[in-house]
Amino acid sequence: MIRRTLAAAGTGLLVAAAGVAVAELLATAVRPQAAPLVAVGGAVVDGAPTPVKEWAVRTFGTYDKPLLLGGIGLALALLAALTGIAARRRPALGLLGPAVLGLAGVGAALTRPDAGPADALPALAGAAVAAGLLRRLPLPGRPAAPNTPDAAADPVGVGRAASGGGAAGSAGVGGPGGGGSDGDGHGAGGSGGSGSAGGPTRRAVVRNATLVAAGTVVAAAGAAVLRRLNVADAARSREAVRLPAPASPARPLPAGVAPGFRTPTEEFYRVDTALTVPRLDVDTWRLRLHGLVARPVEVSFAELLDRGLIERDVTLSCVSNEVGGPYVGTARWLGAPLAPLLRAAGIRAGADQLVARSDEGMTIGTPIETLLDGRDAMLAVGMNGAPLPFAHGFPVRMLTPGLYGYAGACKWVTELEVTTFDAFDAYWVRRGWAREAPVKTASRIDRPAPFARIPAGPVTVAGVAWAQHRGIAAVEVSVNGGPWRAAELLPTASTDTWVQWRYAWPATAGPHSLRVRATDGTGATQPERRRTPFPDGATGHHTITLTVR
């Protein structure tokens, strides 16, 4: 019995793999986001409670997406195995598995913000393939379908004891004409030298499983090849981009800036909901500006590059960043200023929100007043001297200095709608986050590292502090809860970037704690009270402990 159950579970897994492979292959022709695993993953992300999302980002960091997809894959494998077992006992019940999974895939695909009818095709095709194979593929212990090879020889199914034949439960291994057992103690009765009627042969099971496995490998390989071709095409599109010199270049970094002021592109944090990175073609990309405007605008990528680009050093930070966390970075950005585009469109009276929409359906709501107050809000096309990487929004992303990313930094942007906050809540606002999200003043100790063991003597404590668009006026350090001591501020690029700081500490032997706080350009000092990132950013003093030998 155990062996047959495992064989049936294996058949369920094989059938599910075939269905997924076909769905993935078809998704390469529709779009990557239509793949059932990705669509279901997106639905899970959208439906997960905010505390769960925050826990995932805090615990797994940038590995949260692969782990989510892996978890969905494991759940699918479990359901597939159970489906195979159910199909062995009751074929109709077994078909319920592909039906349920197919409906889940279709529902997830069609409820994505940017879904079209074609997005349902991969899940439908995968479910149909799985159901068809499950019905036609011989299962151990189940009679073969009418037009599949019969079990005239070497039966692996459980037969009823026939009159005049072998006894049920015989211990021997039967040949074509005898009652036998497949090793679990259940005999397959025969009559007058004939095999058990209607049961699949081992040869049929192996042959059909091999054919299905081969087809699955071919479909999966085809999907992989097509994905690689699509990625290569997108990469060529990006490599062909030649960014023009900025009409307003960034100022050179002042003397005295320490190494590491700018974050290398490959180390820049990434926090978003995209389970597959969109790879857009600059030749077909368009930006549509509409809504409460007098003159709707549509621009191509080439037209955007002709709009007199600006280049600025700007620090970005994520609202999910915990006190002392890593989700903050500084880069040199190149882009088209957003304010002239909005003014050219003619914003109508009463409009107070600009909603940016990405290619994969994300919505970001930004106060129009903020975009028009003179800050360097832009539609960025370049990062650290090169076109945007795909993971950071290629070909175009929105960037608003002084706001957290969820309120002013839409990646893969394709649409801008002028509207009101009363009329529309953006993605994160619908999930309880604040409508308006100016970056909170923050500071971090980067060295020494937490729990470090260092020798006694002069020690340089160093880190960064940021309050984009307000600037940093002072940074202070406290040792072991003692008085606050002023740290030295290094030169910086502008109020839109972080400030590097350092503090000379005469370290003495023993355990110690170090704490940092910053004061922004308005004179407001970081509050000591610890708060989680939800709903508008974390607060509190970054504190580390270490041992001096």
Feature annotation, model-predicted:
Residues M1-A92:
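Membrane-anchoring hydrophobic segments
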Residues R3-A7, D64, D114-A118, G199, ...:
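Juxtamembrane/transmembrane-helix boundary motifs in multi-pass membrane proteins
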Residues L25, A29, A34, A77-L78, ...:
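Structured, non-membrane catalytic/scaffold regions adjacent to prosthetic-group chemistry
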Residues Y63-P149:
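Membrane-embedded alpha-helical segments of integral membrane proteins
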Residues L103, A128, A209-A219:
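Hydrophobic alpha-helical topogenic segments used for membrane insertion/localization
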Residues P140-A197:
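Intrinsically disordered, low-complexity terminal tails and inter-domain linkers enriched
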Residues G195-A213:
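N-terminal secretory signal peptides and thylakoid transit peptides that target proteins
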Residues V205, G215, A220-A232:
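Secretion-targeting segments and adjacent low-complexity export tracts
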